[in-house]
C-alpha cells in the first residue's frame, strides 16, 4: 500500500519540550530554511525560544501531570504571550505542534502554505501525538499492528493495511458503539438475572413456607394417627381383657355350680351305700350312673398366646415406624442429590457397559439421519391458544383466539407450550423443525414439568430439568435453569435437534442446503425419559416438524420470517 501523504509540515517552530526533527527535502515538504516566511512565521521565529520556556514550565506544572491528553482542562493558545491575556485555544495543529486561538488560527485559514496542515481539537500535550522514534507527527494507523504511525513508519509497516487517523477513528468508534451495545445488553441480562434471582428468592420463601405448612399438617396427622393407633390398641387390649375375664368368670361360675352338684351326688352315694336291699341298691345306683355328668370344662384361657402375638405386632410396627422417622432427613437429602437418578446407573442395570459407550457424534446430515425419529405434537398438552394442524405436525400461536380443547391435567394453562407425544429415552434421536417468528423456543423437558403454574420454573427456559434454544429475531439464545446464554450463530429457519441420551448431549444445528452448522450444545444429566418441548411466546409464532425426507432449501435472504 502506498504511503499516505496526509500533511505537508511547514516551517513553523514547535512549542513542545521535545520538538520533532525536521523532515528531509525528499519528503516534498519545505524545510525550515527554504521558501519565504509569512509575517506569522517571522513572529514564530522571534518567539520560539520564549515559547519553548513556557512549554517547559507548563510540562513541569504538577497540576497538569497525569493528564497527558488534557482531558477536562482548558487548553490555552500558545501564541498569546501575555499570561494575563491568554485566550482559549480553538484548534491544534499537528504539523506545528501548537495550539491556536481564533485570532492566531487565521494564518492557517488564509495562507495557502499552511492550509495543508492537519488541524484537530485543542490538545494539552502534543508529546503523545508524534512518533517517539522519528519525532514526526502521527498521521496514520496500522490496522494489523493496531498502532498509530508517522510517515516514516510507513516503510517499516510495508504490506500492512494503513488508513488515516480519521478513518481509523471512525472504525474504532463504530467498534466502540458495538462494544457499548454488547456491554449494555450484557448489563441488561445481568440485571434481569438479578431480578429473576430476587424473584426466585421470594418464590423460595413462599415455597418453603408452603412446604413447612404441609409438613406441619402431615406430621400433625401422623401424630394424630399415632395417638389414634395407641387408643385403638389400648381399647383392643381392654376388650380382650374383658372378654378373657368374662370367659374365666363364666367357667368359674359353672365349676362352682358343678361343685355343689357333686356334693349332692356324694351325699346320694353315701345314702345308697347304706341300702341293705340288694334289688333297691342296684336299681337306684344304675339310675344314678346313667344320669351322672362326667364332662368337665377347660379351665385354661388362651389369652396369653394371643397377647404374645399382639405384642410382636406392636413391637415390629413401632420399630418400623421409628426407622421411617429416623430416615426422614436422609431420604430428603438423597432426594435432593442430582446424582440420585444418574441415568448411567439405570442404563448399566439393563445394558452392559461395552454396549453403551458413547459413539462419535455425527457431522453430516446423512450421518444424523441414521438416528431419525418421527415426533408429533401432543394435543393433550397444547395450550388453548395453540392451534395444531397437519396431523399434529404444525403448531401456531393464535392469541387471543382459544381452541375448544378439553381441560386435562396434562394441558399447559399459563405458558403457550406443547410437548411431543413421544418420549426420548436410552437411545440417540434426531429430528428437524422449522421456526417462524421471534420468540420461539425449541428444547427438551421432563414429564413432571408443572402444567398449571405461572412461575418461570413452569416454562422450558426456567428450570434445571429443561434445555431450550430461543430465536429472538436477531440471534439465538440458549436457556437452562433460567440462565440465558447469547449465541453468535446466524439465522436459520430449519433447526436440527440431536439427542444422545446415554452420552448426555443435546445439540442444535442450523440446517442449510449443503451444511450443518452447530448452534449450541448442552451437556445434560438426563434422569428420566424426556420430551421434545416447544414454547411459542408471541402471537403468530409457528413451528413445523419437518418430514426428514424433505431436502433443505437453498439459503434465502431472510431465513427466519413469519409463519406461512
Curated annotation (Swiss-Prot):
SUPFAM superfamilies: B-box zinc-binding domain (SSF57845), Concanavalin A-like lectins/glucanases (SSF49899). One of its GO terms (biological process) is response to retinoic acid. The keyword Phosphoprotein applies. A zinc finger (B box-type) spans 72-122, 126-165. Residues 165-203, 243-274, 320-340 form a coiled coil. Keywords: Coiled coil, Cytoplasm, Metal-binding, Phosphoprotein, Repeat, Transferase, Ubl conjugation, Ubl conjugation pathway, Zinc, Zinc-finger. It is found in: Cytoplasm. Its EC number is 2.3.2.27. Zn(2+) binds at residues 131, 134, 153, 157. SMART domains: BBOX (SM00336), PRY (SM00589), SPRY (SM00449). It catalyses: S-ubiquitinyl-[E2 ubiquitin-conjugating enzyme]-L-cysteine + [acceptor protein]-L-lysine = [E2 ubiquitin-conjugating enzyme]-L-cysteine + N(6)-ubiquitinyl-[acceptor protein]-L-lysine. GO terms for cellular component: cytoplasm; PML body. The modification Phosphoserine is found at residues 116, 203. The keyword Coiled coil applies. Homodimerizes via its coiled-coil domain. Heterodimerizes with MID1, TRIM24 and PML. Interacts with Galectin-3/LGALS3 in a ULK1-dependent manner; this interaction mediates autophagy of damage endomembranes. Interacts with BECN1. Interacts with ATG16L1. Interacts with p62/SQSTM and LC3B/MAP1LC3B. Belongs to the TRIM/RBCC family. This is E3 ubiquitin-protein ligase TRIM16.
